[in-house]
A protein has these predicted regions:
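Bacterial Sec-dependent N-terminal signal peptides
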Residues: 1-24
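Short, internal strand/loop/helix patches
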Residues: 25-26, 97-146
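Amphipathic alpha-helical repeat scaffolds
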Residues: 33, 53-57
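Conserved helix-turn-beta segment immediately C-terminal to the redox Cys motif
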Residues: 47-48, 57, 61-85, 104-107
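Thiol-based oxidoreductase modules, predominantly thioredoxin-like and allied folds used
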Residues: 77-94, 109-121
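Thiol-/selenol-based redox modules, centered on thioredoxin-like
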Residues: 129, 134-181
Length: 181
């Protein structure tokens, strides 16, 4: 009887741990566009995705130009998603319409831009909690250091790498990732 109870408890523990260790996928999230529409990340299955926290008044803001060029060149295999955030020195103070106008007028941005969110702190958006926590993404812990940090997601919705702001969108590292099979 004791042996049977032990086996039942052991089986319960194993099944419970298996459930805990399963990571969510990038595709499990839904976000809002700058226009307030729902955007289901599952619609991006089969493509690589670069998630970038953006800001209009940052030294890295000119990266919008390279991000747009990359998006235009590789849009068959890559989607870039911008998430405006005001977490660093209040460098994204604009409203949704101001952000859209800024991105379109100054950089011709056509890649998807999402609603302004928080990428750190107690009000961090759930997607960024997933991106920054190994416990959630199953790959690595990171923290968002500054605007224009890039999270690379593979075609299966798994986090692959984090690329910091100083790395340009068209760097060899990023281009190699995009073109790899």
């Amino acid at each position: 009887m004791e042996k049977r109870s032990f086996l039942v408890i052991l089986l319960f523990m194993v099944l419970n741990l298996a459930g805990i260790s399963q990571s969510k996928s990038f595709y499990d999230f839904k976000v809002k566009t700058l226009e307030g529409e729902d955007f289901d990340l599952a619609s991006l299955k089969g493509k690589k995705v670069m998630v970038v926290n953006t800001a209009s008044k940052c030294g890295f803001t000119p990266q919008y130009k390279d991000l747009e060029a990359l998006y235009e060149q590789y849009k068959d295999v890559l989607v870039i998603i911008g998430f405006p955030a005001n977490n660093f020195l209040h460098q994204e103070p604009g409203t949704a319409s101001e952000i859209r106008n800024f991105c379109t007028t100054n950089y011709g941005v056509t890649f998807p831009m999402m609603a302004k969110i928080s990428v750190k702190g107690s009000d961090m958006h759930p997607l960024y909690k997933w991106l920054t926590s190994k416990k959630e993404n199953g790959v690595k812990d990171s923290s968002v250091k500054w605007n224009f940090q890039k999270y690379l997601i593979d075609e299966n919705g798994k986090l692959v790498n984090v690329v910091y702001s100083s790395e340009k969108p068209n760097s060899d590292k990023i281009l190699s990732w995009i073109t790899s099979k």
